[in-house]
Amino acid sequence: MIGLIFGETDFPKYIHKKLKTKKKYTIVDLTRGHVFKKDRNSYSFSIGQFGKIISILKKKKCKKVLFAGKVHKPNFSKIKFDLKGLYYIPRIIKKAKLGDAALLKEIINILKKEKIQTISSTSFTPELTLTKGNYYTHRPDKKDQSEIKTALKHLKRSNQYSHVQGAISRNNHVTLEKKGGTQKMLKMS
């Protein structure tokens, strides 16, 4: 049995359609409109009901979970928490201030402590991933390769706690993705 923790966007719908007949699953629906409520294996929760989410995953014997879709950052002062949610909330708020990557890592660590493994969504959707290589007709020239090396050097310099996920390098000026997200990085470059 696999636990599917779904948020907004079309990606969860794609995974659901693909797994519907192939695997036994339980859906944790974190969407605002409860998109998956018609599925009999779906359970709707708010983000603060962490204890209920973990207990339903354990009750349904889900040893693995998969995250897909976007969950909007909540206003933590307006959320109703259960006991486990209250226990974990200080850590979650602290990581949420660092950015989405830090928050997701913290949730994965919490699930790991509860003996629930997180798996990649690409394990069920390999057709959506690209293999290593150039997918554009333009080959990088020496200047492009130099810019790529500069960006990689800056990415490698960032530590695991900075949660940098991307870099843009132009004319030896490097812009790193920080907690503002990818869109902010693209605007700054």
Predicted feature residues:
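N-terminal beta-loop-helix "entrance" segment that forms/cooperates
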Residues: 29-51
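A charged helix-plus-loop insertion that forms the helical arch/lid used to bind
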Residues: 77-97
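N-terminal basic/disordered segments at the start of proteins
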Residues: 1-30
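Short glycine-rich anion-binding loops that position phosphate/pyrophosphate groups of nucleotides
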Residues: 70-73
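Conserved mixed alpha/beta catalytic, RNA-binding, or beta-rich assembly cores of soluble enzyme
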Residues: 8-11, 44-47, 97-101, 107, ...
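Short, high-confidence coil segments that cap the C-terminus of an alpha-helix
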Residues: 62-63
